[in-house]
Structures are given as C-alpha cells and as structure tokens.
Amino acid sequence: MKPMTMTDLNQLKKEKRKFATITAYDASFAHLFAEQGIDVMLVGDSLGMTVQGADTTIPVTVEDIVYHTRCVRAGTPYTFIIADMPFMSYATPEQSCENAAKLMRAGANMVKLEGGSWLYDTINMLTERSVPVCAHLGLTPQSVHILGGYKVQGRDEVSANQLIKDAITLEKAGIQLLVLECVPVDLAKRITDELQIPVIGIGAGNVTDGQVLVMHDTLGITVSPPKFVKNFLEEAGNIRDAIRLYKEQVESGIYPGKEHSFY
C-alpha cells in the first residue's frame, strides 16, 4: 500500500476531488479507519474532552499527543498523520522546535498550530527545519476563553477579512494545509479558492477541499453535538460502515449538507 503524502493531497485539490479526515487516538481505531479508506488522520487535542473528560482542550500536554500519535502510527503505517500542538506548546520559537520534533519522532507527518498571522515567524522557522505545518483558523478551541465560547467566527466583514488575510499570510509563511472551523460557507469558499494549498473544513460547509470530524461525533457518542455533526452510525448500523459512509458522503459532497452549515 502506498503512503499518503502532501503531493497526493495537492493533486486532489487540483483535481477538485474531496477527501475525508477523522480524529484518531489509538491503534485499533486507526487501523479500522485505514481499512475503510481514510488516508488522513488527526491526533487532535480534542482527546482532552473525548478521552480525558475535560471541558476544554487546554489541559492536554505535548506528552499526551506524543503518546497517542505513537498509538495511531502503530495501527496504520501508511496514513498521513497530523498531530496537534497543544495549548502553550508553541509560545516561543525554541519551544515550537522542541515540541514539533517530539511529535514528528512519534510518527506524525505534520504538526497543527492554532492561530493567525502572529504565527508567521514560528511557521516559517518550522518549515525551514523540515517540519510540515498545518494551520487552524476560525474557531480555535485553545482560545475558547478569549473567544467567549464555541461560536461561529467570521460573520461580520471585519472578522471575515481578517481571516482571509491570516490565511494568505500563513500560506506565505509555509503552511501546507489549513483547517477552517465554524465559519460561514461563503467565507470558507473564498478562502478555499484563494489558497493554493488544501483546506480542510469542520463546520465550514461542503465547499472546502476536505472535511474532518471528531471520531466520537461521527459515531453519535458526543452528548449535545454541534450543528455540523452527523451521526453516521445511526444510518449505517455498524462502525465500519459508518466510517465508510462518512468517507463516501464527503467525497461526493453530500456531507456536510445545508443543515450542517452556517450562513
């Protein structure tokens, strides 16, 4: 089996073929997801809430992400793995390099950082040192206390223009992927069309190049799930078919539908 690479993901964008991504935290589920054709997985700091039972992602440590990245890599040798850099793990350039190296050694293909234009120097430094970077804009869960909760971002002209500016700036800094969370569909389309790199949406409509969901959300485990979530297990009947259905509906553009999107 051929490993998934950024070259492949860039080609998918060029061909306007959508791809599905899912969070993974252990070897067993990672193997199951790979069997269903999921080629990109995110070891997300969402594990703080889904696995550890915290109210936010803030308590998650680098060591937590390292541990779960190793577990996921053990379950799927060919998958493209993105590992979250958790809260305050990239506050300084030195810290960023040290922690990114830990995640790459654990089996990640790329690290993900939350934040806008202020990350330019950090991203530039990491990419110059051969660390592929994914940025995360829109609703950034590590900033939940500053944002005042989990709210849709970019609804007014000023904030929308800032997100567009941030996306362009971060692409110039060297990011190779962008996650765009909880923004209106029209803004997601503007950013996706503007950038040369693939954009992965979550709560951003079906106009992005790819989609990502927390695995617990796809399987209907989450209590009071967000609007953009669909319970694929309810329709499919078993976990394997649920993941396959998620992948198929993302690739065909069926999911997310209007009922899962913000306008």
Curated annotation (Swiss-Prot):
InterPro entries for the chain: Pantoate_hydroxy_MeTrfase, Pyrv/PenolPyrv_kinase-like_dom, Pyrv_kinase-like_dom_sf
Alphabetized GO MF terms: 3-methyl-2-oxobutanoate hydroxymethyltransferase activity; magnesium ion binding
Record's cofactor remark: Binds 1 Mg(2+) ion per subunit.
Catalytic activity: 3-methyl-2-oxobutanoate + (6R)-5,10-methylene-5,6,7,8-tetrahydrofolate + H2O = 2-dehydropantoate + (6S)-5,6,7,8-tetrahydrofolate
One Pfam family this sequence matches: Pantoate_transf
Keywords from the named record: Cytoplasm, Magnesium, Metal-binding, Pantothenate biosynthesis, Transferase
EC number(s) on file: 2.1.2.11
Entry's Gene Ontology BP terms: pantothenate biosynthetic process
Pathway stated in the Swiss-Prot or TrEMBL entry: Cofactor biosynthesis; (R)-pantothenate biosynthesis; (R)-pantoate from 3-methyl-2-oxobutanoate: step 1/2
Disulfide bridges in this chain: none
Active site residues according to the UniProt entry: E181
Binding-site positions, Mg(2+): D45, D84, E114
Subunit structure: Homodecamer; pentamer of dimers.
Alphabetical list of HAMAP family matching this protein: PanB (MF_00156)
Family label: Belongs to the PanB family.
Official protein name in the record: 3-methyl-2-oxobutanoate hydroxymethyltransferase
